Amino acid sequence: EPIKHWTEKLNVGPFFILEHLDLKDVYYYGKNGEENEIDFSVALAYSGNMQIELIKQHCDTPSIYNEYVNHKKNTLHHLCTFTKNIENDIKILESQGYRNLQGGKTMDEGTFSYLDIDNNLSPILEIAQLSEGALGMFDMIKEASINWDRKKPIMDLGEISI
């Protein structure tokens, strides 16, 4: 349903679905461990230079994603910025009052953290230090959006030819 809204009403697409992302070293409010394994998928698209990320969690593991849904929020969840030194940026943000809510690593050694300053849960700030492979994938998805003909709202990454 959300993809249909973005593609038909807002002319954003195509979306690329990454199913059941594999993360490691996930923490949630400072708690590490196996109990924090989150099963979720994302659908990615671009509108100009802005990446749209639709997240669907498939489990009941506590996370900022289902915490948001449980609070029945219907607004922007988070904004993301990329960094080359995530540890330093986290320290700076925490010194300014931000709380590190959730984070972890991707299988290609990218690192991400979600931070909030006022317990409002909207919008949360995500900072991510990504691998070259992830940045390249995002570039390919962005390029696919430029000449999108609206015929296929959902595409497979293998369909991208640049």
Where are these regions (language model features)?
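Short recognition patches in nucleic-acid-associated and regulatory proteins
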Residues: 18-21
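A short linear hydrophobic-aromatic micro-motif
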Residues: 100-102
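Glyoxalase I/VOC metalloenzyme domain signal
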Residues: 1-16, 32-41, 46-97, 116-162
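Short acidic/glycine-enriched loop/turn segments that link adjacent beta-strands
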Residues: 107-111
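Short Pro/Gly-enriched beta-strand edge/turn motifs at strand-loop
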Residues: 23-30, 96-98
